[in-house]
Swiss-Prot record:
It comes from the Eukaryota. Residues 888-1071 are annotated as: Interaction with PPARG. Widely expressed. Found in heart, brain, placenta, lung, liver, skeleatal muscle, kidney and pancreas. High levels in skeletal muscle and pancreas. Low levels in lung. Isoform 2 is expressed in keratinocytes (at protein level). A motif (Nuclear localization signal) lies at residues 789-805. Keywords: Acetylation, Biological rhythms, Cytoplasm, Disease variant, Nucleus, Phosphoprotein, Repeat, Transcription, Transcription regulation, Ubl conjugation. Homodimer. Component of the circadian core oscillator, which includes the CRY proteins, CLOCK or NPAS2, BMAL1 or BMAL2, CSNK1D and/or CSNK1E, TIMELESS, and the PER proteins. Interacts with CLOCK-BMAL1 (off DNA). Interacts with BMAL2. Interacts directly with PER1 and PER3, and through a C-terminal domain, with CRY1 and CRY2. Interacts (via PAS 2 domain) with TIMELESS. Interacts with NFIL3. Different large complexes have been identified with different repressive functions. The core of PER complexes is composed of at least PER1, PER2, PER3, CRY1, CRY2, CSNK1D and/or CSNK1E. GO terms for biological process: chromatin remodeling; circadian regulation of gene expression; circadian rhythm; entrainment of circadian clock by photoperiod; fatty acid metabolic process; gluconeogenesis; glycogen biosynthetic process; lactate biosynthetic process. The gene is PER2. Residues 504-516, 529-541 have a biased composition (Basic and acidic residues). This is Period circadian protein homolog 2. Pfam families: bHLH_PER, PAS_3, Per3-like_PAS-A, Period_C.
Length: 1255
């Protein structure tokens, strides 16, 4: 570097000064002497042909130097050069003295020496044919000088513009103090020295004595010199980037003797090469150092003013294969590279193993460093990386070139990070372990061979092939690849506990890939949609959060314009990019995190929440935090039996979690509840929390044209295979669950699309009816804007559920409908849109096995009646249903009798219903005849389907009061419900069809509700224990728009569906076995899951919809009864079951299930439980002993006293309706000690026997 001082650049024109000739003759003669001396000297040293060898490289370099320094007229032939050089050397000037000649000779020798030293610094890639030419050397020297000067100027500009850091915080030392405070850190390591570099001038103010032994030079060599002069030229930029004043930590942070650790160095350290003088081989040898910078102030001895300095602790890095060697098992490092095969990051551990500093490899081609024979392997490796989809895998060893030119053999493991939005590989992660080291253990030795100036054509071609390969989106069968270095366990697979089907994911994957191949647009526009998908996600989320009503208002106009197209949304949806598991999971994690910010920190392990208890919405949490009412601090009472069962995931017929739930996070347990049961699917469906929140799913979902239900009935007969818990099994299970998760989300999406179209259809019909606009609670028939409604592009019609345009039963085509006058004598607040319908055929009572009496009057066709202005309506009386919020349909007998005609038979399971009042008193409708029910049917069904529940008959109140019936019989109150029936997925027909939204207050002051009752907040003073045994005093009525006579072609089905929904919400257990309706589970079983309690609303999670009624706490219900002090805070809406009555009859028939024998189902379940229990893991004796040593409480069995609490902190009212089961009752035997087994005997029989007894 000292040679750089001989060629300082001029401030005015630095590029011309070294090459411009001087006007005087003496400097010109010096230049000629330099060129001649350079030529002759180099020829004598390096060329075997002697001075007369004109074709040597040394003569060529001499000629280049002569052409640089001589003026144009002095450029002559090589022979002339030789004559001039001989004349200048052997014929000195007669006018001068010998002293002048000797000074010229000394100057000439010094120039030759400097030029040779400059040639040593020339990198190998700048050399021509392995030789350093004079021109290339001078150019490189000039560029290096400019770089150093530019760095200094930038440094000064940075210091002047930003100002100095606060002087009060920066410690100040003198040179002597600096030596004392640094000695305690460097005295322990002989390869470590300390140096203080001024941040103002760049000069060395202090350097420790260890440099003399490290560099074998005197300490004075560093005095009054700039530190960058000792660095390798290509490391100067790295040094300046890491020593910016505002990036440096204060020395006081690590000034303590014990606080300075290796971890502290690794966080802030960087690598540079340092050299002082050339070695005995007559070339400069740089040594790599790890440098850790700190910010201090140093006061110079002469000046009183202290200046900011960078204190560097530099430690020399030795080869990992030389003593002290790195152990073979620790010779591991990682790299990342981009899809175009450029190094993106290199682990620091690679420095002693490869000899390269991180800056040497970053942004350089990977293939250049590999052995030529191993380069083709990289194409196969990247193909497997694309197929694995983020899963790490091992591959055959490769040979990697170290800095000294030798190859080391590496065992490699590869993985990748996949962008969840574009589904493309962002970067590839390689984990390498050295198998065979180099023969030359000094990996920092100089490379003896010349480096390639340009990439070999084969490298370039191979790189292009790999880059084109990785432009493809990753197949969806792969996992996320989120984990660092390919660790897929770092993210949470929330689906694993509810899955029981082994083929759902694979079927969905095959179908998805086949559809991608069929869709030409998607195949052609991969790169297009990959760039747009992220923007669509962000845009959709922003739009839905900021202005959802504005989006919804534009939907009717949009759909009106597309009436001529059969399925416009379906066509548009096919072109949208696919929605991946990562997208849904990422957005769900963000949403749950944001919700947890408002959640009160009350998650203590007093009682566990089962996975099927829906998580609180953010509005619930805000209310639970600020509301003084009973909602605050109340959550659903837990079902410990449910969470303690050890049923595995292979049990296809049980809606139970596959493992005991974690208590770390309430939201993580409740985000995916097994409540959505589809017909034909034998596994609990994971409910997606973001069905209503996250806009990414509906927008980017791959809309399949096939039916929504892909799983056949044959899956339940899948044999039980005894599999070990291996890495392959876990990976396959993870992929299967992700695919199943996406499939269920897709089905939910399709269902919501169908519902939104039904909603729009009913809105279009009800336009022009002012009474409907003011009738609250009627979402499906009113013109009220729905805040949850997505835009038109997010919905698609399902062809098999669309009514024909010429249908006389429905106006589903969306055309304009003329307004009809209201019905004569119709009470506007006592009719539900599902209770009145247009019917083209008379109705009859339901056939068996209906458990209660339905008085279904009949009436003639609309054309035969002339008295009323609108067609009359069929109606029926709903019996008393055991729900926590009793609701009874108001009925009106028809005005005219008519002959009976057959209707569609809707088969029902043997659900148990308490018998209800057949009809209302005739006093309400004195002018109309009453049609009695069938007593035979009533008595038969009451005796056949209610063996355990005594019959109760409620006295109706005026008008249509809700009868008070108990949801739990006395026989079931004294014991815990069976653990197999704790699931809230009680109805297989519950297809995520209930959508809740707020209904603004209308002019009538009466808030309308539906037959679907929410399991949440009933009144301000309702306690968890009261709603099981008492009914709310406020009768619930509904307003009916006058146009609903055209809304229901299947009034029998819609009314029954409404009734089923009431029963489904009342029963906490229902049909836990999700195989069929005929499983025969008790409809009104006592359940500690708290379905009848008045907790904060969980139905939004339960049904996968927005519980926006929680958002409007001002919505009250004025009843006019004696109990008018009760206010209804939750305004419920009609489920989509009623809307589905407008669908075609063939569609409705697809939801019928054959009944199954209860005993046969239970017998299968017991056998599966027994098989699964054999597969449960058992502790070995050594494991038991180890656990006893760590956890003393395991010696006695049970749980530690800190968490062994039998109470539930969420149960404030300790009445008989609240059943909180202690932990000891459901703890399975851990097999830890004899005491544990004894305790199990005391508490009862083992789990499987108790299950059999209780079922």
């Amino acid at each position: 570097m000292n040679g750089y001082a001989e060629f300082p650049p001029s401030p005015s024109n630095p590029t011309k000064e070294p090459v411009e000739p001087q006007p005087s003759q003496v400097p010109l003669q010096e230049d000629v002497d330099m060129s001649s001396g350079s030529s002759g000297h180099e020829t004598n040293e390096n060329c075997s042909t002697g001075r007369d060898s004109q074709g040597s490289d040394c003569d060529d370099s001499g000629k280049e130097l002569g052409m640089l320094v001589e003026p144009p007229d002095a450029r002559q032939s090589p022979d002339t050069f030789s004559l001039m050089m001989a004349k200048s050397e052997h014929n000195p000037s007669t006018s001068g003295c010998s002293s002048d000649q000797s000074s010229k000779v000394d100057t000439h020798k010094e120039l030759i020496k400097t030029l040779k030293e400059l040639k040593v610094h020339l990198p190998a890639d700048k050399k021509a044919k392995g030789k350093a030419s004079t021109l290339a050397t001078l150019k490189y020297a000039l560029r290096s000088v400019k770089q150093v000067k530019a760095n200094e100027e930038y440094y000064q500009l940075l210091m002047s513009s930003e100002g100095h850091p606060c002087g009060a915080d920066v410690p100040s030392y003198t040179v002597e103090e600096m030596e004392s405070v640094t000695s305690e850190h460097i005295v322990k390591n002989a390869d470590m020295f300390a140096v203080a570099v001024s941040l103002v001038s760049g000069k060395i103010l202090y350097i420790s004595d260890q440099v003399a032994s490290i560099f074998h030079c005197k300490r004075d060599a560093f005095s009054d010199a700039k530190f960058v002069e000792f660095l390798a030229p290509h490391d100067v930029g790295v040094f300046h980037s890491f020593t910016s004043p505002y990036k440096l930590p204060l020395w006081s942070m690590c000034s303590g003797a014990d606080s300075f650790t290796q971890e502290c160095m690794e966080e802030k350290s960087f690598f540079c090469r340092v050299s002082v003088r050339k070695s005995h081989e007559n070339e400069i040898r740089y040594h790599p150092f790890r440098m850790t910078p700190y910010l201090v102030k140093v006061r110079d001895q002469q000046g009183a003013e202290s200046q900011l300095c960078c204190l560097l602790l530099a430690e020399r890095v030795h080869s990992g294969y030389e003593a002290p060697r790195i152990p073979p098992e620790k010779r591991i490092f990682t790299t990342t590279h981009t899809p175009n095969c450029l190094f993106q990051d290199v682990d620091e551990r690679a420095v002693p193993l490869l000899g390269y500093l991180p800056q040497d490899l970053i942004e350089t081609p990977v293939l250049v460093q590999l052995h030529p024979s191993d380069r083709p392997l990289m194409l196969a490796i990247h193909k497997k990386i694309l197929q694995s989809g983020g899963q790490p895998f091992d591959y055959s060893p490769i040979r990697f070139r170290a800095r000294n030119g030798e190859y080391i053999t590496l065992d490699t493991s590869w993985s990748s990070f996949i962008n969840p939005w574009s589904r493309k590989i962002s970067f590839i992660i390689g984990r390498h372990k050295v198998r065979v080291g180099p023969l030359n253990e000094d990996v920092f030795a100089a490379h003896p061979c010349t480096e390639e100036k340009a990439l070999h054509p084969s490298i370039q071609e191979l790189t292009e092939q790999i880059h084109r390969l990785l432009l493809q989106p990753v197949p969806h069968s792969g996992s996320s690849g989120y984990g660092s270095l390919g660790s897929n366990g770092s993210h949470e697979h929330l689906m694993s506990q509810t899955s029981s089907s082994d083929s759902n994911g694979h079927e969905d994957s095959r179908r998805r890939r086949a559809e991608i191949c069929k869709n030409g647009n998607k195949t052609k526009n991969r790169s297009h949609y990959s760039h747009e998908s992220g923007e669509q996600k962000k845009k959709s989320v922003t739009e839905m959060q900021t202005n959802p009503p504005a989006e919804k208002k534009a939907v009717p106009a949009m759909e009106k314009d597309s009436l001529g197209v059969s399925f416009p949304e379906e066509l548009a949806c096919k072109n949208q990019p696919t929605c991946s598991y990562q997208q849904i999971s990422c957005l769900d994690s963000v949403i749950r995190y944001l919700e947890s910010c408002n959640e009160a920190a009350t998650l203590k392990r007093k009682c566990e929440f089962p996975a099927n208890v829906p998580a609180l919405r953010s509005s619930d949490k805000r209310k639970a935090t600020v509301s003084p009412g009973p909602h605050a601090g109340e959550a659903e009472p837990p079902s410990r039996v449910n969470s303690r069962t050890g049923v595995g995931t292979h049990l296809t017929s049980l809606a139970l979690p596959g493992k005991a739930e974690s208590v770390a996070s309430l939201t993580s347990q409740c985000s995916y509840s097994s409540t959505i049961v589809h017909v034909g699917d034998k596994k609990p469906q994971p409910e997606l929390e973001m069905v209503e929140d996250a806009a990414s799913g509906p927008e980017s979902l791959d809309c399949l044209a096939g039916p929504a239900l892909a799983c056949g009935l044959s899956q339940e007969k899948e044999p039980f295979k005894k599999l070990g818990l291996t890495k392959e099994v876990l990976a396959a299970h993870t992929q299967k669950e992700e695919q199943s998760f996406l499939q269920k989300f897709k089905e939910i999406r399709k269902l919501s699309i169908f519902q939104s179209h039904c909603h729009y259809y009913l809105q279009e019909r009800s336009k022009g009816q002012p009474s409907e606009r003011t009738a609250p609670g009627l979402r499906n028939t009113s013109g009220i804007d729905s805040p949850w409604k997505k835009t038109g592009k997010n919905r698609k019609l399902k062809s098999k559920r669309v009514k024909p345009r010429d249908s006389s039963e429905s106006t589903g085509s969306g055309g304009p409908v003329s307004a009809r006058p209201p019905l004569v004598g119709l009470n506007a607040t006592a009719w539900s849109p599902s209770d009145t319908s247009q019917s083209s055929c008379p109705a009859v009572p339901f056939p068996a096995p209906v458990p209660a009496a339905y008085s279904l009057p009949v009436f003639p066709a609309p054309g035969t009646v002339a008295a009323p202005p609108a067609p009359p309506h069929a109606s029926f009386t709903v019996p008393a249903v055991p729900v926590d919020l009793q609701h009874q349909f108001a009925v009106q007998p028809p005005p005219f009798p008519a002959p009976l005609a057959p209707v569609m038979a809707f088969m029902l399971p043997s659900y148990s219903f308490p018998s209800g009042t057949p009809n209302l008193p005739q006093a309400f409708f004195p002018s109309q005849p009453q049609f009695p029910s069938h007593p035979t049917l009533t008595s038969e069904m009451a005796s056949a389907s209610q063996p355990e529940f005594p019959s109760r008959t409620s006295i109706p109140r005026q008008p249509c009061a809700c009868p008070a019936t108990r949801a739990t019989p006395p026989s079931a109150m004294g014991r815990a419900s069976p653990p197999l029936f704790q699931s809230r997925s009680s109805s297989p027909l519950q297809l995520n069809l209930l959508q809740l939204e707020e209904a603004p207050e209308g002019g009538t002051g009466a808030m309308g509700t539906t037959g679907a009752t929410e399991t949440a907040a009933v009144g301000a003073d309702c306690k968890p224990g009261t709603s099981r045994d008492q009914q709310p005093k406020a009768p619930l009525t509904r307003d009916e728009p006058s146009d609903t006579q055209n809304s229901d072609a299947l009034s029998t089905s819609s009314g029954l569906l409404n009734l089923l929904l009431n029963e489904d919400l009342c029963s906490a257990s229902g049909s836990a076995a999700s195989e069929s309706l005929g499983s025969g589970s008790l409809g009104c079983d006592a359940s500690p899951s708290g379905a009848g309690s008045s907790d904060t609303s969980h139905t939004s999670k339960y049904f996968g919809s927005i519980d926006s009624s929680e958002n409007n706490h001002k919505a009250k219900m004025n009843t006019g009864m004696e109990e008018s002090e009760h206010f209804i805070k939750c305004v419920l809406q009609d489920p989509i079951w009623l809307l589905m009555a407008d669908a075609d009859s063939s569609v409705m028939m697809t939801y019928q299930l054959p009944s199954r024998n209860l005993e046969a189902v239970l017998k299968e379940d017991r056998e599966k439980l027994k098989l699964l229990q054999k597969l449960q893991p058992r502790f070995t004796e050594s494991q038991k002993q180890e656990l006893r040593e760590v956890h003393q409480w395991m010696q006695t069995g049970g749980l530690p006293a800190a968490i062994d609490v039998a109470e539930c902190v969420y149960c404030e009212n300790k009445e008989k309706g609240n059943i909180c089961i202690p932990y000891e009752e459901d703890i399975p035997s851990l097999g830890l000690s004899e005491v544990s087994d004894t305790k199990e005997d005391e508490n009862g029989s083992p789990l499987n026997h108790r299950i059999e007894e209780q079922t």
